[in-house]
Amino acid sequence: MRKIFVLTILLSLIVTSCQNDKTYKNKLQVHYEHLDPQEIIIKDYAKALFSLDTANFADEIRKIQNEFPVFLEGDLNDIGAVNYLKGFATDTFCIRINNMVEKKFSNNNKLAKDIKSVYQIFNYYYPNITLPDVTYLYVSGIDPNIPSVMIMPNGILISADKYLENENSIYDYIGMPRYLSQRCRPSYITRDLAKAIYSTYIDNKQYQKDVLTDMINAGKELYFIEALNPSLPDSIIMGYSSKQMTWAEEYEGDVWAAIVGNNMLYAKNAEIFRSLFGDAPFTQAFSNDSPARLGEYIGLQIIRSYMTNNDVSLQEMLNNNDIHQIFQTSQYKPRKS
């Protein structure tokens, strides 16, 4: 009889644990399909630019100015500006990249569908904010200083050449580290779109206050990205390889124990910030198999735990600036491996 009682208690604990583990996921499954879909228009500026007759470039570029004002709002009577554009459109490396872009993005129906889904979910949460209805594909020359997705007042800009999956080893050719080029895939576009939406419309936080604050602020952003992309795997949300994701999940408790045990939770040291939040191939303090930005990963787990254990909405969580209240009520207690 005692064995049956103990077994019943154990099963109850397991079921309860599983239910709690899924609660935040349940909150992310919102019913947005009934909302009127915002029309998604995709315009290919790259194709238009690189298709121009370069023998008569000045006249040709003016013909597409009205269709692509976000790129061509300057004075096209300025010979210097025209020559700059012509130089870009005739650059052999840029032409090579554009040829890859045309092949990779020959059909944008799926992209439009994916963007529409992100828009609908965002409008479910924020019905009073209207996102731009035009998305532009363009070639940046794989400029590392330009965000892959940007939101402008009159359009969303997607640097299509940053989503080529290292085709023909193009990212290796320019010396891009593999930990960065692994994120240069079309499956990252809606993740980067959600990130751009967050930074444009939602985020008002100050970072590098202390480690815990940065963890939770990073966790808020990642949870928002997940909310707008509930089907994306954690590896894409975090920007990790599958191997790195496995390591993070397996050693989460050990990482947390090291942070707490070494009194880093409220640290303000720049070196500690770099170790926990800096982008790199791995986190040197742990293992060559570990991913970087483990502070962000822990932050996401804290927010997930907070959403699981508290009856709050996405907006309420994002608007809550009481870092310590979030941490205390999250009941975050990972187990060591």
Question: Where do the PLM segments sit?
Answer:
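C-terminal motif of bacterial Sec signal peptides marking the signal peptidase cleavage site
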Residues: 14-17
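C-terminal soluble interaction/assembly domains
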Residues: 266-337
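Acidic/His/Gly-enriched intrinsically disordered linker/tail segments
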Residues: 218-282
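Sec-dependent signal peptide recognition
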Residues: 2-8
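Sec-exported extracytoplasmic/periplasmic mature domains
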Residues: 50, 69, 73, 123-127, ...
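Extracytoplasmic/secreted proteins, especially bacterial periplasmic and envelope-associated proteins
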Residues: 44, 117, 121, 219, ...
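N-terminal mature-domain "stem" immediately C-terminal to a signal peptide or N-terminal signal-anchor/transmembrane
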Residues: 19-93
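Acidic/His-rich structured neighborhood in mature extracellular/periplasmic domains
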Residues: 85-245, 315, 319
